[in-house]
Amino acid sequence: MTLSTPSAPATALPLARTVPRREYWFGLPALCTSARSARDTVRDRLRAWELPGDTCCDAVLLVSELITNAVLHTGSGRVLCGLTLTGDERRLRIELHDECSAPVGPPEHRAGPGEENGRGLLLVQQIADSWGCARSTRAEGKVVWAELTAAC
């Protein structure tokens, strides 16, 4: 897989295609150690919802990247993570709300070839069916969201 500059994310939250059937929210302190807690929480919840293993693995990676970005780049004290499974149980939406007051949009920095960090949103772009960011309606900052189609 070749990673390039992330394309601009969608700036509006698309309307849900169907009425949500299952929803789960949890908050965490914005600490480096919270990524592990988030991964464990998401993995446990999606297994309880009996989602396919591939979907669970992709969702765990997405949450890990989103929370790591929030911790490293937003100055937030807390983050709020939401999982929503649509009524047809085929679409999983992941939301990460932070306390960042910076303008909504893709980051300015692009990782160079020798840099170890700076490719998280490229992974999000490659793994998610769709993703974007907008002003949060649940926190004082923004929300970065990603959607997956559950593997059959």
What are these language model-derived features?
Residues W25-S37:
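STAS-typified acidic loop motif
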Residues L28, L46, L62, L66, ...:
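Generic leucine side-chain signal with a strong bias for well-ordered alpha-helical environments
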